[in-house]
């Protein structure tokens, strides 16, 4: 699942390119996670537009709607409902140790919301609600899948075998794409000059690579 954006080029290399190769081997679900996106302030109309555009970009990159289930997260209320239940089986300390939370909290100390803190619980719900066996992720998301397994095991220990325990599926190539501006950091939309968007103009792409 990918949050709606202008279409990060690293998302294509790190995820979508690998997803296209998976669609003939597995039963796949691809989700535009617009609920995750609102952990930072969003313009509602713009978020809706970007969500639909992102689905269109998925299809343009080779994901076949006839072979995959493709949808927008907020259109399926069970994601939010299960997230609340799973949150009741998640420890505060587990969430406070999440590397991405610590990184984002350090960068945005004036806007540390409960939504940002519980982001991994909603991600766990995204996975467990579909009884997924494998979760295609980059290396930076492996910790979230491991937390998802821990939550599922804890829930299963109380109520019996309810959830499938997922495994991270990390591609050998493109598991972590680095910033054009800072090769020690992951490429991120928070640094527009350090990343390439799929919808960038050719001259903008060349400018970014020449400055790298």
Task: Give the residues covered by each predicted segment.
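Short, glycine/charge-rich beta-strand/loop segments that flank catalytic centers
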Residues: 66-80, 99-109
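Glycine-rich loop at the start of a catalytic domain that most often binds anionic cofactors/ligands
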Residues: 38-55, 81-89
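Active-site cores that bind ATP or allylic diphosphates and position pyrophosphate for catalysis
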Residues: 102-212
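Single conserved hydrophobic/aromatic residue that forms the stacking wall/gate
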Residues: 1-8, 12
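Acidic, His- and aromatic-enriched active-site or binding-groove loops in soluble protein domains
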Residues: 90-101
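Histidine-anchored nucleotide/phosphate-binding helix
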Residues: 13-29
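A glycine-rich helix N-cap at a beta->alpha junction
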Residues: 50-70
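Short, conserved active-site loops that position catalytic residues or coordinate cofactors/metal ions
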Residues: 28-41
């Amino acid at each position: 699942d990918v949050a709606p954006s202008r279409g990060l080029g690293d998302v294509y290399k790190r995820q979508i390119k690998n997803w296209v190769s998976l669609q003939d081997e597995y039963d796949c679900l691809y989700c535009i996670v617009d609920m995750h996106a609102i952990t930072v302030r969003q313009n509602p109309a713009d978020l809706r537009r970007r969500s639909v555009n992102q689905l269109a970009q998925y299809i343009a990159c080779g994901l076949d709607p006839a072979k995959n289930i493709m949808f927008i997260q907020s259109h399926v209320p069970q994601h939010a409902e299960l997230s609340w239940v799973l949150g009741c089986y998640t420890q505060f300390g587990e969430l406070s140790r999440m590397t991405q939370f610590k990184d984002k909290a350090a960068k945005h100390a004036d806007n540390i919301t409960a939504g940002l803190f519980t982001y991994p619980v909603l991600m766990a719900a995204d996975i467990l609600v579909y009884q997924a066996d494998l979760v295609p992720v980059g290396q930076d998301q492996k910790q979230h899948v491991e937390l998802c397994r821990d939550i599922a095991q804890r829930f299963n220990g109380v109520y019996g075998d309810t959830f499938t325990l997922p495994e991270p599926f990390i591609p050998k190539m493109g598991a972590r794409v680095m910033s054009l501006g800072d090769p020690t950091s992951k490429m991120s939309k928070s640094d527009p000059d350090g990343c390439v968007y799929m919808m960038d103009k050719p001259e903008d792409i060349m400018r970014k690579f020449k400055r790298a």
